[in-house]
Amino acid sequence: SGLCENDIDVVFAGDLLNQCIGSSFSLREKQIPFIGMYGACSTMTLSLINAAVFVESGAAIYAAAVTSSHFCTAERQYRFPLEYGSQRPPTSQWTATAAGADIIGLGENKPYIEYATVGKIVDLGVKDANNMGAAMAPAAADTLISFFKDTNTVPEDYDMIFTGDLGKAGTDLFYELTEREGIDLRCRHSDCGLI
């Protein structure tokens, strides 16, 4: 980005650990204001939206959106510790061990954030902790349907539409729910949990 540490006005960061401890430790020696984000699978998007709002409002010139995840910590946090040795059903997610960061600032260069629609809780009563894709699919479908209505756009206006980690079962339900509203996403959508 060509920026120095002191060019960043605020960092929005999160991970899949209690108290955003991974993010806190990684930023503890930096002299940058830090706002912890905890949205599980939506942490990166949540961080990007907040960073964009800060920059657009003038509260920051540059804001960082950061997230990280670790397979073993996600297993411990959301399912069973690996030491427990439980069997994984086919609907279980496989959390990536990964990290990513974006710097948000005003400018004309693409890519840029033009729209954001924050989702709401849509609970269809899924109780299986090993089928988080089906638990998340209703909110993902509702958010995307709202986004198309809010922006007066259709799937064909986009090169690709990605969801985070619905997996196979969640993606099938996601398609079923969007198709009920007359929206066919099959040619424009990919789920990162299926890549």
PLM features: what roles do these ranges have?
Residues 9-10, 14-18, 23-62, 69, ...:
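Claisen-condensing/thiolase-fold acyl-transfer catalytic domains that form or cleave C-C bonds
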Residues 26-33, 52, 56, 72-94:
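Cofactor- and metal-binding active-site motifs of prokaryotic enzymes
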